[in-house]
Amino acid sequence: MRINPTTSGSGSGASTLAEKSVGRIAQIIGPVLDVAFPPGKMPNIYNSLVVKGRDTAGQQINVTCEVQQLLGNNRVRTVAMSATDGLMRGMEVIDTGAPLSVPVGEATLGRIFNVLGEPVDNLGPVDTRTTSPIHRSAPAFIQLDTKLSIFETGIKVVDLLAPYRRGGKIGLFGGAGVGKTVLIMELINNIAKAHGGVSVFGGVGERTREGNDLYMEMKESGVINEQNIAESKVALVYGQMNEPPGARMRVGLTALTMAEYFRDVNEQDVLLFIDNISRFVQAGSEVSALLGRMPSAVGYQPTLSTEMGSLQERITSTKEGSITSIQAVYVPADDLTDPAPATTFAHLDATTVLSRGLAAKGIYPAVDPLDSTSTMLQPRIVGEEHYETAQRVKQTLQRYKELQDIIAILGPDELSEEDRLTVARARKIERFLSQPFFVAEVFTGSPGKYVGLAETIRGFQLILSGELDGLPEQAFYLVGNIDEATAKAINLEVESKLKK
């Protein structure tokens, strides 16, 4: 991390540029530039180079590149972070003498940045003098926090069945329209309220429209506070689909660098979203091919595991704070053995799978209770009571799933008394796994609910014990804790009597 001195006047800026080594463009192949430097003035790997000048039409050009290879004969091969249109051989290239650095700290909250850490939301410059290089080593072993603790989200289905690890990595699997964005926003909202933490969202190879939609929805739901931007709970970093592979490959590191500052300096719990981690791999594959490396399995880069590891190993808990990461994972052609998802799986502590079937039933969050998994769901970590309750909930739902074919063909009357009871309880559990969200208040009109882990366990234990068998299943739909479900049942009974 670096505190930048404030520079005043143009003289100081000119003198610093004079001290930098200057090279010239020798070759341009798409986003890859070869630059020749004077002998003894070669930049280091990962140094940031800047091309400034005018194109043939007289337009100002400002392109930042990153050194990837030292070719010999005083030439380096670099990858551009923005479009190379208008660049020509012979143009001057300035070596900044350091890796790409981006602004960090509270001033980044509520703002949108590109890979270079430049604000792109038309709200003026970012008021920060503190910057940090995007290439850093992972925390040393001595700094790591080895304690296994659950990261409580206040979302019943997650906390009970696939709990998140504090400082862990979670894979979020979901197609379009199943509530991924709303779940992301609720997690951002809840971490700010319950943990006093902040969030960083890294849009890696995103559709520009989706990034814009997310920003608008965050403003609407209050996650980004337009009136007082400092009150916002999230910083956004976008490297969109239309940008060169260099930008898409590095935007995840820009977001991670901002998150690391909140963890290490502010000692906060940070939530880091990466959407989509598979596009980070894809961008790395493109860059690898452009640099002339021999491809590995299925055409991926030979350095796939190293690149993934260098990003993932920085996402961890230290004695100061934690970075808990939620990463959307795209599975090419639904093939889980593809190198990209297979390499990602090796780093994940939990998976949250969103189901289209549950979304179609109107059960939100549409988290699949049987497909979602977590390494934290062990008796020695979560305790016997939590573990037993979660296992019984899964068994009940699994039995209901097995009986659905019989119900569809023969009807519920053909089931045994025991199975009928299981189905009734499973339907209550399924509905009780739904929950009203704070960020969805604007659309639904019903206030959001944060449910603590102890309350969640108590609620499911009561359903499983049969104490609530007499209550109608709609009483369990979109409520917070179990007391709200019993109160809703009384209200439903009163309403039905009034109708009669």
From Swiss-Prot:
Top EC class for this record: translocase
Single GO MF descriptor: ATP hydrolysis activity
CDD domains the UniProt entry points to: ATP-synt_F1_beta_C, ATP-synt_F1_beta_N, F1-ATPase_beta_CD
UniProt xrefs under InterPro entries: AAA+_ATPase, ATP-synt_VA_C, ATP_synth_F1_bsu, ATPase_a/bsu_AS, ATPase_alpha/beta_chains, ATPase_F1/V1/A1_a/bsu_N, ATPase_F1/V1/A1_a/bsu_N_sf, ATPase_F1/V1/A1_a/bsu_nucl-bd
Cell compartment(s), UniProt: Plastid, Chloroplast thylakoid membrane
Binding site for ATP: G174, G175, A176, G177, V178, G179, K180, T181
Pfam family, one: ATP-synt_ab
Self-association state and partner proteins as the record states: F-type ATPases have 2 components, CF(1) - the catalytic core - and CF(0) - the membrane proton channel. CF(1) has five subunits: alpha(3), beta(3), gamma(1), delta(1), epsilon(1). CF(0) has four main subunits: a(1), b(1), b'(1) and c(9-12).
Record function comment: Produces ATP from ADP in the presence of a proton gradient across the membrane. The catalytic sites are hosted primarily by the beta subunits.
Protein name in UniProt: ATP synthase subunit beta, chloroplastic
Organism in which the protein naturally occurs: Amborella trichopoda
Lineage: Eukaryota, Viridiplantae, Streptophyta, Embryophyta, Tracheophyta
Encoding gene, per UniProt annotation: atpB
